[in-house]
Amino acid sequence: MYIPNSEEFLKGIKEYRKYEKRDSMYKVATFLVSHFWGKFADMSDGLGVILLTWNQAFYRYGLLDFDKLESFLKDNFADIEYFRKRNIFSFEANDYEKIKNLFNELLIATGINSDKSDSKTSPVSVAKSLHILCPEFFPIWDTNIAKSYGYNYLTSPSRKYLEFSRDLKELANKIKGYEGYPLDRPLIKLIDEYNYSKYTKGWI
């Protein structure tokens, strides 16, 4: 796995914040989910903000079902709260089964019904949703980021996400000692900003 040095990591964050104007939706979504924590309909609205902006390419082919999203939150709230209290450094093998179950259920809850697209589910939507719910613990990926780390999530996406999370724990442990990075976001979000700049957009 490639480990950026401090200069490259900070440059990736800087370029992300220079060019990525949609990040305001991240602030809105995290605020809504936090403010309405435990109110499942409102929490699903907060997740919808991030999904319909950050993954709009997927949802142009079908509608996000907010009722299914609300049911997922209600049925899995205990596990969601469990991971919300933790950070990526505590990720361990004992978490695999719970994370796999959350991932697979959320894959259905964030899916679409559409005749216009071959893909009815989005592992990208799952990762973004999990991160908004548990921003210190769950990492974010997209197609380019996942492939850059060696993962093609078209098959066994939940297993690939577990392996990706393990890799990002290792990366976080390597870069946590770097100086000068912003403290306004969780480290796992800063890593996503770097990944997005490098692997998705090629800004660095």
What are these regions (language model features)?
Residues 125-132:
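Short hydrophobic alpha-helical segments that form membrane-spanning helices or hydrophobic packing faces
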Residues 1-117, 135-204:
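An N-terminal alpha-helical hairpin/helix-loop-helix interaction module that forms a charged
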